[in-house]
């Protein structure tokens, strides 16, 4: 599938592979993962500033869109043209560093 190909191209090549990591989680993680619902706690984070970043080609984009809808203000959703799910891990040409710096500066120091 395209999703398998995207993850393979990152995690199984020099781009994202490391001899110190494994994509095989311990079996004890499976139950925790299956019981994890990330949207459940959004209201405990809001109204703190929330920033959601997704790629317009990301298979996971719908999750960012849904989380953004559930979050209270202040919130910001940034969609990066041409980016897939893993592209923002290492494709620094796509990472909006100026926008990230502005968000954190405004959010962590609202007085300027």
Question: What residue ranges belong to the model's regions?
Answer:
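Conserved beta-strand scaffold positions in the cores of enzyme catalytic domains, especially
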Residues: 77-79
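Acidic beta-to-alpha connecting loop that harbors the catalytic carboxylate
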Residues: 55-58, 82-84
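Short beta-strand/loop motif that positions the catalytic acidic residue
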Residues: 45-46, 51-54
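Accessory cap/linker subdomain of secreted extracellular hydrolases
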Residues: 1-25, 29-30, 39
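Well-formed, non-transmembrane alpha-helical positions, independent of function
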Residues: 41-44, 66
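Catalytic active-site module of serine/aspartate enzymes centered on a nucleophile-bearing elbow/loop
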Residues: 81-112
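Conserved loop-alpha-helix segment in the C-terminal half of the alpha/beta-hydrolase fold
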Residues: 57-75
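Structural motif corresponding to alpha-helix initiation and N-cap regions
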Residues: 35-39, 61
């Amino acid at each position: 599938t395209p999703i398998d190909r995207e993850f393979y191209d990152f995690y199984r090549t020099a781009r994202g592979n490391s001899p110190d990591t494994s994509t095989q989680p311990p079996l004890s993680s499976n139950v925790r993962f299956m019981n994890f619902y990330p949207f459940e706690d959004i209201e405990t984070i809001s109204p703190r500033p929330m920033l959601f970043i997704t790629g317009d080609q990301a298979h996971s984009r719908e999750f960012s869109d849904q989380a953004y809808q559930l979050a209270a203000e202040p919130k910001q959703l940034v969609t990066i043209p041409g980016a897939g799910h893993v592209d923002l891990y290492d494709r620094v040409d796509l990472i909006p560093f100026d926008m990230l710096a502005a968000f954190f500066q405004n959010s962590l120091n609202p007085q300027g």
